[in-house]
Amino acid sequence: MIIEKEKMEEIMSLVIEEANIAIKEGNSPFAAFLLDKEGNILYRAHNTSNTNTDPTAHAEINLIRMACKELKTKDLSNYILISNAWSCSMCFSAAIKAKINRFIFGAESESNMNPNVTIFDIKDKCKNEINVISGILRDECKIQIEEARS
């Protein structure tokens, strides 16, 4: 099933709210949700790297760990990941390892990522088909990230 743009924007506004929780807790301004194919929100997570003193506690990693544990599976191929920014190489690779193949993103990745490997660099090397929709509430997501970083 295809999720309408209006529904994606509605969900992205909730992702932005979740990212605000990360910011208030002193973490990086990122959040991610796991959706079913109809666009229903099943799981929510935000970055907790600083509060957990864990450099791998990005929103997507937290989300994947939570969903796999609760669903008792490592196969998330029936779900969609939505995030306020392009995933870093670690998170995008982890999502692909969890067999997620549908992604919805807001803003592009930050240019200072290390390593600076984009989702499209990784997507181009995947053996399976990966579907990416980007730019949903892009400006709102970008402003949130820039303001949190300043």
Regions inferred by a protein language model and the residue ranges of each:
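Glycine/small-residue-rich phosphate/adenosyl-binding loop
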Residues: 43, 60-70
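Immediate flanking context of iron-sulfur cluster ligation sites
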Residues: 73-85
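Short loop/turn motifs at secondary-structure junctions
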Residues: 28, 75-77, 99
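Small-residue (primarily alanine) positions within well-ordered alpha-helices
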Residues: 15, 19-22, 32, 59, ...
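Short beta-strand scaffold segments in enzyme catalytic cores
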Residues: 30-39
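Zinc-dependent deaminase
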Residues: 1-25, 41, 87-150
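A short, polar/charged loop-to-alpha-helix boundary motif
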Residues: 51-61
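Short beta->alpha transition motifs characteristic of CBS
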Residues: 42-50
